[in-house]
From Swiss-Prot:
This is Beta-defensin 125. It is found in: Secreted. Residues 110-134 have a biased composition (Low complexity). PANTHER family: BETA-DEFENSIN 123-RELATED, BETA-DEFENSIN 125. Has antibacterial activity. Disulfide bonds join C27-C55, C35-C49, C39-C56. It comes from the Eukaryota. Residues 109-146 are annotated as: Disordered. Belongs to the beta-defensin family. One of its GO terms (biological process) is innate immune response.
Length: 146
């Protein structure tokens, strides 16, 4: 009986010590794949392991291996604003434009002045142009027109 107990202990220790044990060897990054002769339906072939085995990685997303990174914690005390470049910051969304003075354009070239409330007429630019149109030489016109 002592010999039988000794045999069971040795067999138990051998299964713990053996490298292959009873599961297929692991492969890929962080040992998430398994080396098999043929990948299962829920697995994808990635690369070749030793002894002509395929490294198979599961297609189904496992949150054990693919964890999302934690969101950075932002404390309101850490946020500072620098208003040194703004001269007069009022906190309102109004622009620095003054809406008290408006120019009413009634006709082309005629505007109302806000001080006297009289129309001023400005002459539009003259339409006479003194540009000469030159024709290219006949040799170049034959090249440009097909």
């Amino acid at each position: 009986m002592n010999l039988l107990m000794l045999t069971f202990i040795i067999c138990g220790l051998l299964t713990q010590v053996t490298k292959g044990s009873f599961e297929p060897p692991k492969c890929w990054k962080n040992n998430i794949g398994h080396c098999r002769r043929r990948c299962l339906d829920t697995e994808r072939y990635i690369l070749v392991c030793r002894n002509k085995l395929s490294c198979c990685i599961s297609i189904i997303i496992s949150h054990e291996y693919t964890r999302r990174p934690a969101f950075p914690v932002i404390h309101p005390e850490d946020i500072t604003f620098d208003y040194s470049d703004v001269d007069s910051f009022t906190g309102s969304p109004v622009s620095m434009l003054n809406d008290l003075i408006t120019f009413d354009t009634t006709k082309f070239g005629e505007t109302m002045t806000p001080e006297t409330n009289t129309p001023e007429t400005t002459m539009p630019p003259s339409k006479t142009t003194t540009s000469k149109t030159t024709m290219p030489p006949p040799s170049q016109t034959a090249l440009t027109h097909n």
